[in-house]
Amino acid sequence: MDKRWNLIWFKIQKLNNYWKKKEKLILFVLAAAQFTHIVDFMIMMPLGNYLMPYFKISTQQFSFLVSAYTFSAAASGFTAAFFVDGFDRKKVLLFGYTGFIIGTLACGLAPSFYLLLVARVLAGLFGGLIGAQVLSIISDIFPYEQRGKAMGSVMSAFAIASTFGVPFALYLANLISWHAP
């Protein structure tokens, strides 16, 4: 009887260690998604000195580029709140992140102001979906007692994006071109 309990205890510990490793991987992936989403949102403001002369646009037109992402992200996040609960969260996150990558790549490849504006709207539509899904996944996966720690870990991506992501993106813009970040 004692051997059986020891075996059961060993298997429980092994499963617990496996789950902790998986938790860390999940948190890293979710934080990376938040990081890229926030860098993409924030990078436009400091790129104004590159974009306005490149596209020969006014400061008002540049403000459209900055706000296009914000408004489309807000609209998609609000609208998605009514629909996405019926779908698998992982699939919605993957769908949103795929669209976000396409929109972000389109931003870097945009040859004109209007195409960049459309690409910013597209990236924002999917970016808004990402932010909501990340928090929903944390709420689903982590027990109540661990949720605050998990959300804090993922939300630290905001601080990292602003302190390291944006300066690195500006470094790439200086080194290569505004298309790089």
Model-derived features with residue positions:
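Helix-loop-helix hairpin linking two adjacent transmembrane segments in secondary transporters
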Residues: 153-181
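Extracytoplasmic
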Residues: 25-59
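Membrane-interface helix termini in secondary transporters
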Residues: 50, 78-82, 171
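Cytoplasmic helix-loop-helix junction between adjacent transmembrane helices
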Residues: 119-157
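Conserved MFS/SLC helix-loop-helix module at the cytosolic interface between two early adjacent transmembrane helices
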Residues: 75-114
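Residue-level signature of mid-helix packing/kink "hotspots" within the transmembrane helices
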Residues: 42, 70-78, 162-163
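Juxtamembrane helix-start elements in MFS-like secondary transporters
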Residues: 58-66
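Small-residue-rich segments within alpha-helical transmembrane domains of MFS-like 12-TM solute carriers
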Residues: 38, 42, 124-132, 163
